A protein has these predicted regions:
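A short helix-loop-beta submotif of the ANL/AMP-binding
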Residues: 129-135
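A short helix->loop->beta-strand "cap" motif at the edges of active sites that frequently abuts
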Residues: 132, 189-192, 220-221
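N-terminal small-domain helix-loop-helix segment of the aminotransferase-like
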Residues: 3-94, 101, 275-278
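Conserved PLP-anchoring active-site segment centered on the Schiff-base-forming lysine
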Residues: 105-127
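PLP-dependent enzyme catalytic core of the Aspartate aminotransferase-like
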Residues: 73, 153, 335-344, 350-381
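Conserved core segment of the aminotransferase class I/II
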Residues: 215, 220-291, 295, 299-300, ...
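Active-site phosphate-binding strand-loop segment of PLP-dependent enzymes
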Residues: 139-207
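Conserved glycine-rich beta-strand-loop-beta hairpin in the small C-terminal domain of fold type I
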Residues: 273, 289-298, 308-321, 355
Length: 381
């Protein structure tokens, strides 16, 4: 007997499809967002150390104390706010689990949730499984800025949650402090929560650095901020993330977390805590690290017929291929992989409504040689 699907429209993600296609055709994989280089040697050594020391049993449900303390210190350093170690920080099995737990905890059947398209593909299924209704606000290229009048018009008595993402995947734009002020002005008199997906917080090239919801005194009282150590330390396979939220929200989120995963890899948590404490220069220097790769890739693509859109954060570039082909973006990405040998992601998969723009996403979290080889192929188009 085959059960009725709760998510009938969903299949294998485009990221899995394109990575498989890239492997099949031995293409340079700039589609899925992972590095082709390893993370810090010190972090690997600390993981091995903690395994050898016997830290191989369940961690506390909320995360090991050393890591929660390190997160609190980093948050205070960067955003001027020190969350309570015991009641406001929860370590999760990657950022995606944190997003799912937050949505499940906050969204009730019939609630409306606002997100901004293009958007990360895990939001919609989580909202659907919680019984909520997703209302999407389309952001327009090339700058993908929020129209706050349009946002205010989208609010209703049913609005329960706003999901934002900064630095933004896939558009590579970032929110400014003025955006958070505008968000607060729009929701201050309403019972609306905020889920701020900040997994690329340390890959921000904007003047003044990353603007976090945690730096806004009023918003953080009703917000969940989510981040990812996989992005920060080039270790996406470790799947360790965390969220910061007020105690009352964290308590509800933890009820979901304890029955999703209960706890997270113990030696990895301890190794990350060591890394944050002993080598904070890693995340402080990360913007410069990725800016160098971004600039190298953009310069190498200059002779191509691709139009590169502004990149203020993340490790993704958007490229307009309208001067090259009339194909839709999904077909173009498949052709690019099979015939040119470079795998990319079509922007339309991040949107529910028809996406008329000819844009693809390219990941530059790669070694310089990989980026130059990909650029050589793309410049031949």
């Amino acid at each position: 007997m085959i059960p009725e699907s709760k998510l009938p429209a969903l299949g294998t993600t485009i990221f899995t499809q394109m990575s498989a296609l890239a492997q099949q055709h031995q293409a340079i994989n700039l589609s899925q967002g992972f590095p082709d280089f390893d993370g810090p040697r010190y972090l690997q050594e600390r993981l091995a150390y903690h395994v050898a020391q016997g830290a191989n049993q369940y961690a506390p449900m909320t995360g090991v104390p050393a890591l929660r303390e390190a997160i609190a210190g980093k948050t205070a350093e960067l955003y001027g706010y020190q969350p309570d170690v015991n009641s406001e920080i929860t370590v999760t099995a990657g950022a995606t689990e944190a997003l799912y737990a937050a949505i499940t905890a906050l969204v009730r059947r019939g609630d409306e949730v606002i997100c901004f398209d293009p958007s990360y593909d895990s939001y919609a299924p989580a909202v659907a499984l919680a019984g909520g209704e997703l209302r999407r606000i389309a952001l327009q290229p090339p700058h993908f800025r929020v129209d706050w009048r349009q946002f205010a018009a989208a609010l209703s008595e049913k609005t329960r949650l706003v999901i934002l993402n900064t630095p933004h995947n896939p558009s590579a734009t970032v929110w400014q402090r003025e955006d958070f002020a505008a968000l607060w002005q729009a929701i201050a008199e309403r019972e609306i929560y905020v889920l701020s997906d900040e997994v690329y917080e340390h890959i921000c090239f904007a003047d003044g650095g990353h603007a976090s919801v945690l730096a806004h005194p009023q918003l953080r009282e009703r917000a969940v901020a989510v981040s990812s150590f996989g992005k920060t330390f080039h270790m996406t396979g470790w799947k360790v993330g965390y969220c910061v939220a007020p105690a009352a929200i964290s308590a509800e989120l933890r009820k979901v977390h304890q029955y999703l995963t209960f706890s997270v890899n113990t030696p990895a948590q301890l190794a990350i805590a060591d890394m944050l404490r002993e080598a904070p220069e890693h995340y402080r220097e990360l913007p410069a690290f990725y800016r160098e790769r971004r600039d190298l890739f953009i310069e190498a693509l200059r002779p191509s017929r691709l139009e590169i859109l502004p990149c203020e954060g993340t490790y993704f570039l958007q490229a307009d291929y309208s001067a090259i082909s009339d194909l839709d973006d999904v077909s173009f990405c498949r052709w690019l992989t099979t015939e040119v040998g470079v795998a990319a992601i079509p922007l339309s998969v991040f949107c529910a409504d028809p996406f008329p723009h000819k844009l693809i996403r390219l990941c530059f979290a790669k070694q310089p040689a990989t980026l130059l080889a990909a650029a050589t192929r793309l410049c031949q188009l």
